[in-house]
Amino acid sequence: MKIKDAVNMIRWKYREKIDDYVVIIIDRLTENGLKEISFSEIDDVDNNYLYLKSEENTVIPLHRVLMIKRKSDNALIWKR
């Protein structure tokens, strides 16, 4: 499954529990090199980018996405 498809599946199929899901990305500015982004922060996704709901209009390239996890049981939904 492609990243875009996994993100859209969670956004639409599990929208009632959207806060239970996170995207883990590579972030060079953090100490451990990873950053969790809640699905509630995602505004849109296309073939190349995740678009976040923010004043800065943050755009994250999909090649930085490492995995998608469900927080409640730490289940791995998608992994590169």
UniProtKB/Swiss-Prot annotation:
Signal peptide: none annotated. It comes from the Archaea. It holds the Pfam family MJ1316. Belongs to the UPF0248 family. This is UPF0248 protein M1425_2629. It comes from Saccharolobus islandicus (strain M.14.25 / Kamchatka #1).
